[in-house]
Amino acid sequence: MSIPILALAVAIYGLASVGIGPFFGAFLGVALMALGLYTLAALRVFARPGRAGRLAGLPAALLLIAASAAWEIYVPQSDLFYSAALEDEAADDIPEIVTEDLYYAQPTLMQAALDGLAPGTPREPELFALLGAGYAYQDVFMSEVDRTATLLAARHGTGRTVKLANSEKEPTRLPMLNHHNLSDGLQALAGRMGPEDMALLFFTSHGSEDRLSLSFYEARLEGLTPHDLATKLDAAGLTNVVIVISACHSGSFIDELAAPDRLIITASAADRTSFGCADGRDWTDFGRAFFDIALRETPDFRAAFTRATRLIEGWEAEQGRPASHPQIAEGAEIGPVLDALFAIEISQGG
């Protein structure tokens, strides 16, 4: 019984060695553990009668379980599970990333980003923004950040937006979206905003049911959980906040972030995926519907959400995809601040 199981484990490793994606390492660790547990269970059913028969396959089962634990702890999966052939094909487009240089660049990049923030005009509602791209290995996320920044500059002027992005191809064009830079960016917004101003936080990345991916393997970043973001917002003292998250399962952020002075918009429900994160695209499906279409028709985030949701429902129905169910949660106190900001924008022809 243990010989076929070991053979299957070797086959799995062989598949991994040709490079089938950065997430395969986690799968292999789980697979090894499952194979070990399966072997233990099989011993109960198929082993020869007697103690010796039951113990015959025990070493193999324990070896698989130990291997799975060692795999998860010690093996640098992000380096191992990229195909060398695929890396060679893209070598001309991707610079060599030195982790030490990447981190040494952050203070300078972040200072330049924050120096570009202008203070708010007293008693005049204005929109400040922090935009973040979390996943370094697909260009669509940085593209969304850049294009959203361009849209906001046309609507609200320059000098009020901070951009953070993880990018394999342009690792030092913008500060990384990591925990430290995010905290500094939120505090900088809070320091420049007045009580009449609004902050837009937009995050675009992959997501799971408990976190937003901040994936940049050379930088060893940790994902952003709903609790992480809520804690950073509270620490910064940021008020009057619109939070837009374009990621799978992004609705899982709503309960933790909900507050009277916040409007929260997500691309999907907590148990649903969103779509459109392929390389070569300018926008994800939600980013396109919300920013590129709906917000060009209306300055009101709430009305734009309604318009974007209808667009997405239509696209998903046409393509036979499961519904993503975008979500919105409006705090009891943020409505008047939103209305004042949008009234000024409409009066100025925005």
Positions of PLM-derived features:
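Alpha-helical transmembrane segments with an aromatic anchor "belt"
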Residues: 1-7
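Loop/turn elements at helix/coil->beta-strand transitions in domains of secreted/extracellular proteins
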Residues: 125-129, 158-161, 194-199, 237-242, ...
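Solvent-exposed, polar/charged alpha-helical surfaces in well-ordered, non-transmembrane soluble domains
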Residues: 143-150, 154, 180-187, 227-231, ...
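Active-site-proximal C-terminal subdomain of hydrolase catalytic domains
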Residues: 21, 31-38, 242, 247-338
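Active-site microenvironments of hydrolase-like enzyme catalytic domains
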Residues: 190-218, 247-273
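Second-shell loop/turn segments in exported
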Residues: 132-139, 167-176, 214-220, 243, ...
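Boundary/activation segment at the start of structured domains
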Residues: 14, 18-196, 281, 342-349
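A short, glycine/acidic-enriched catalytic loop
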Residues: 205-237
